[in-house]
Design a protein with these regions (language model features):
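Hydrophobic/aromatic-rich structural module bridging two neighboring secondary-structure elements via a short loop
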Residues: 79, 84-95
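Terminal, membrane-proximal amphipathic helices
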Residues: 1-79, 101-259
């Protein structure tokens, strides 16, 4: 999938920034240790906050994360203080880097609050599944149809438990592809199944144009709120909800393929 590989180059540059990587265990302990007894911390780390805490608490912490990241994005330079080699490797315009760095940081935090596993299992490199999860986070934040349903049903531990009871409804990669493709279009990349012009130079000006066209730091708050709203549906996620999400994904994939 040449289109996805090209867009991933942008993603891979941004995720190299130290500010982007959220250590799940440290984040969860920092945010929830005051709400729990010490003996509950292992359960928090193993099963996630949704196994121990009310939706009210989860939503409150999530909203605080949205507020904090919006403020950071407005006043912190993610490129300041970077080692020379890493700074030189970032070829994306600074304003684009800034926006996506804090968007991805916020998205990870919201994901961990509502039950997602550690995206950085290999510590240094993101797996393909982890990269797809980040793309879906951004897709939800940008309002791409089908991404919220796919994010919920496509692999989170809660959904995996539900899937065991209805294996015939399991998602296939053929359903993932059209929706991921649509997310990439939202990034401003002109996608074709035949491939794309090679090189980052074709991507960066488009991303810069999207940003200057209104994708500013001020939009991060509603984008974060959109992701929080959809992820919060994972609290008490049921078989009925899973089936509804799968049907939404199937319909959206058919619509996209018919375009």
């Amino acid at each position: 999938m040449a289109e996805q590989e090209l867009a991933m180059q942008v993603l891979q540059q941004v995720v190299k920034l130290p500010v982007v990587k959220v250590e799940r265990s440290k984040f969860l302990v920092d945010k929830f240790s005051k709400e729990l007894d010490p003996q509950d911390i292992p359960t928090l780390l193993e099963q996630g906050p949704t196994s121990l805490l009310s939706q009210e608490i989860l939503d409150r912490v999530a909203n605080a994360c949205i507020r904090d990241n919006v403020l950071l994005a407005s006043g912190t330079s993610v490129l300041a203080g970077l080692p020379g080699g890493l700074a030189m490797a970032i070829t994306i315009p600074a304003d684009v880097t800034q926006f996506y760095a804090f968007s991805l940081k916020l998205a990870q935090e919201l994901g961990y609050i509502y039950g997602y596993e550690d995206l950085w299992a290999s510590r240094e490199e993101l797996s393909e599944d982890a990269q797809n999860t980040l793309l879906l986070y951004l897709g939800v934040m940008l309002g791409v149809n089908g991404t919220a349903a796919l994010l919920r049903a496509g692999g989170i531990t809660i959904a995996k438990q539900v899937m065991k009871t209805i294996p015939n409804k399991a998602l296939t990669k053929t359903l993932w592809y059209p929706i991921l493709k649509k997310v990439l279009k939202i990034f401003g990349v002109n996608l074709t199944k035949g491939g794309l012009a090679k090189g980052m130079g074709k991507v960066i000006p488009i991303l810069g144009g999207v940003l200057s066209g209104g994708l500013t730091f001020a939009t991060m708050k509603p984008m974060g709120e959109s992701l929080q709203k959809e992820l919060s549906k994972l609290v008490n996620y049921s078989e009925v909800q899973y089936q509804e999400d799968v049907e939404t994904i199937r319909k959206e994939a058919e619509i996209i393929e018919g375009e």
